[in-house]
Amino acid sequence: MVAQYTRDNAKIAVIVNGVAYEGWLQSEVDRNLEALCGTFSIPISLVPGKPPAIKRQDSVQIKIGDTVVLTGYVLAAEPFYRRGDCGMRITGRSRAGDLVRCSAIYKGGQWRSAKIDRIIKDIVQPFGLDVKVDTDIGAVVQDFKLGHGESALDAVARAARLRGVLVTSDDAGRVLLTKAGTKRFKGSIVRGQNVIAMEGIGSDEERHSEYIAYGQSTDLTMDFDQARGLKASAKDDEITRYLPLVINADGNTTQAELTTLVKHTVRVRRGHSMGFRYQVEGWTFEGEPWPLNQRVAIYDDVAGLDGAEWLICGVKQTCDLKEGDVTDLTVRPVEAYDTAPLKTKVKRHNWGNRGNTTNHPRGPNDKAGGG
C-alpha cells in the first residue's frame, strides 16, 4: 500500500557570502549521474542601482528547504531588465566541475602500487577538492600514468574504471567514489498522486545482438597463438536481428578481462535502452529533496511498473510561472550504471561538455582505447 502523497512547501535558497537569496519566480538546479558536476541558473530580483553583492567566482551553496543539494561557484552574475522586471541571473556549477576542462598535473605523472583513492586524491587536491570513498575500491593499481594533456576528469574516471567504481560528486562538492543505487529513497513515484507528466526515453538504437571483444596478452604461460588471439563474446537474447559489434581492446589484457568487458557491455546497453522522464509535484518528498543515485519505487500502470525500483539518474528542480515548483526525474534500471573493473574504454564522443564519469562503454564510436 502506497502512502498518500502530501505536497511540501520547500524553498530554494542561494547562499552567497553568508546571505541567503530566495523567493523568486524562476529557478533551475540540475544534477545528473553522467555529469560530474551539477549546475544552477537562478534570476534574482533587484532594485535598480542596488545590485546584490554577488560576483563571479564567489563560493555558493544551493539549499532546498533545510538541505544543501549543491556546493560550488558562481560562474556568471549578469544583470537584465525588461518591462516591469529587473534582476541579475546567477549561474554556476558544483566545485567538482573544475575537473572537467582543466588538465591533470602531478609531479612525475605516475603512480606505482597505489590504490585509486590515493591516485584520485593526488589529482584533485590542487583544485582544493576532497575525496569521499563510499564503496570498496579494490586492490592497488600497479602502474598508473597520466596522459600528456589529459584532463583531470578523464584521469579520475580512468583510474576509477580500473576498479569498477562510479565517480560523481556529493552535495558538499566532494568527489565521490561509489556504486549505483546502493540506497533506496523513502519516496515513490505514483501516477495519479504526485506525477504531473511522464514520457518514455528508451531506445534499442545502441543495442546489439552480440558483443565480441578481441585482445592480446603477454602472459608467458600461454603459447603465441593463444596470447595473440584472445576473444570473448556475449549475446543480448532480446535482440533477434543480426547486429554484431566488435570491440578491440588495446594494450595487454586477459581472457577474464575480455569476458567481463562483453558481459558488462550487454548489461549497460540494455539498461540504457529503457528509461522514463517523470515530472513530479514539488521539490521534496516528506521534507527531503529528491536525490540522485538512489532507487525509487514506481507505481505507473501506463509504464507497466507496479512497485519496481529504478535508479534516479537525473534530477532537475525548476520553478516557473506556468508549472510552479516541480522536479523532473530521469529513471533507468540500475544495470544501466553497472560498474566492473575495466582496462579498456570504448570511446564516446557524445558526452557534451559537462564530462562523463560513468563506467560503461556505449555511444556512436565504438573503437576501444587503452586505459
Residue positions per predicted region:
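Assembly/oligomerization scaffold segments
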Residues: M1-A104, G164, V190-A197
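Short beta-strand-centered interaction patches in the first periplasmic/extracellular domains
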Residues: M1-Y5, D85-G87, S94-L99, V133-R207, ...
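Amphipathic, non-transmembrane alpha-helical segments in extracytoplasmic/periplasmic proteins
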Residues: G18, F40-I42, V74, G92, ...
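An acidic/polar, Gly/Ser/Thr-rich interaction patch typically located in mid-to-C-terminal regions
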Residues: E22-A53, I196-G371
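Short, compositionally biased
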Residues: L75-R83, G181-K183, E309-L321
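Short, charged, solvent-exposed linker or helix-capping segments at domain edges/interfaces
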Residues: V100-Y106, G187-V190, E323-G324, A340-K345
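Short hydrophobic/aromatic-rich beta-strand segments that constitute the beta-sheet cores
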Residues: R101, L176-T178, A213, I298
